[in-house]
Swiss-Prot record:
Gene: SUB1
PANTHER family listed in its UniProt record: RNA POLYMERASE II TRANSCRIPTIONAL COACTIVATOR
Protein family: Belongs to the transcriptional coactivator PC4 family.
Broad class of where this protein is predominantly found: nucleus
Stored SUPFAM superfamilies: ssDNA-binding transcriptional regulator domain
Name used for this protein in its record: RNA polymerase II transcriptional coactivator SUB1
Compositionally biased region (Basic and acidic residues): 133-166, 179-191, 204-240, 251-267
Keyword Signal appears in the UniProt entry: no
Biological process annotations from GO: cellular response to pheromone; cellular response to stress; double-strand break repair via nonhomologous end joining; hyperosmotic response; negative regulation of ascospore formation; negative regulation of DNA metabolic process; positive regulation of transcription by RNA polymerase II; positive regulation of transcription by RNA polymerase III
Misc note: Present with 7820 molecules/cell in log phase SD medium.
Modified residues (Phosphoserine): 119, 268-269, 289
Transmembrane segments: none
Role, per record: Plays a role in the release of TFIIB from the transcription complex during transcription initiation. Binds to TFIIB and specifically inhibits the formation of the TBP-TFIIB-promoter complexes.
Keywords assigned: DNA-binding, Nucleus, Phosphoprotein, Transcription, Transcription regulation
């Protein structure tokens, strides 16, 4: 047997067994005046809550414990969580939201207005003793101490939480999905998602370009056919013979021409008559002059 094992067995026998040594170990790191039974609480099966102090920081540990078969002692496991005082206060502040979320998940928890806690009584005492506290502060107590700031902050948050109307209160977070529900939702997302293959991107662009070129070619072909039809119709109109003039119009034209010719002939005969008459008058005058 090694020196270490002999020393450990001797210390265990001096302390009165493993339970006592376990209590001493659990009491290590705690402030004086606080026993292990006051700082350790059992939670269900193989779980404990330990209130301890580490580097002047108060911690609340929730850890799993297992039974060591070699020593018969309960030793802390790897699974657990540590909360500071601020986190613990925030957890208590949201206890109503947590209860509501649990009820939405199907829990049979009764719906109560408020759970009375020791901290609530302390806040009420602080509210009742505001005047005395102010006097003490005037007498020289430090208002900016961390403890005083923490108390004021918690008091203000509780007052605002109580005075806040129901409509403005934050709604509880939606319930977390169960594993099979999450799988169903993921399957729906994958089914509706668009599949993009890196190597197919260029091919898709080429297909779109070919489709566009094909549509443009069809449009140009349709335009050419329309122009050809238009030209053919124009040629047909040019090749058609002119309609023959109406006979009545031609007869009217001939009558007008004959009337013009007759008027011309009449004018010419009048001139000849005037000339002959003038010649006879001149001849008669000549004869008279000769006789004289």
């Amino acid at each position: 047997m090694s020196y270490y094992n002999r020393y450990r067995n001797k210390r265990r026998s001096d302390n009165g067994g493993g339970n006592l040594s376990n209590s001493n170990n659990n009491n290590g790191g705690m402030p004086s005046g606080l026993s292990a039974s006051d700082a350790i609480f059992d939670l269900g099966k193989n779980k404990r809550v330990t209130v301890r102090q580490f580097r002047n920081i108060n911690l609340i540990d929730i850890r799993e414990y297992y039974l060591d078969s070699s020593t018969g002692e309960m030793k802390p496991g790897k699974k657990g969580i540590s909360l500071t005082e601020d986190l613990y206060d925030e957890l208590l502040k949201h206890r109503l939201n947590i209860d509501e979320a649990l009820r939405r998940l199907g829990s049979k928890r009764p719906k109560t207005k408020m759970v009375r806690l020791l901290s609530d009584d302390e806040y009420e005492d602080d509210n009742n003793n505001d005047s005395t506290n102010n006097d003490k502060d005037k007498n020289g107590k430090d208002k900016n101490s961390p403890k005083k700031r923490r108390e004021d902050k918690s008091k203000a948050s509780n007052e605002s939480h109580d005075l806040e109307p129901r409509s403005k209160k934050k709604k509880p977070a939606p319930p977390t999905l169960l594993p099979h529900e999450e799988n169903i939702q993921n399957a729906e997302r994958e089914a509706n998602a668009t599949l993009i293959i890196p190597g197919q991107a260029g091919r898709k662009q080429q297909e779109e370009r070919k489709q566009k070129e094909k549509e443009e070619a069809e449009e140009a072909k349709a335009k050419a056919v329309a122009e050809q039809e238009k030209e053919a119709k124009a040629k047909e109109k040019i090749a058609e013979p002119e309609p023959e003039p109406v006979p009545t119009l031609q007869a009217k034209k001939e009558d007008i021409v004959s009337n013009i010719n007759e008027s011309k002939d009449a004018n010419s005969s009048d001139e000849e008559f005037a000339q002959s008459l003038e010649a006879e008058m001149n001849k008669a005058e000549d004869d008279i002059s000769e006789e004289e």
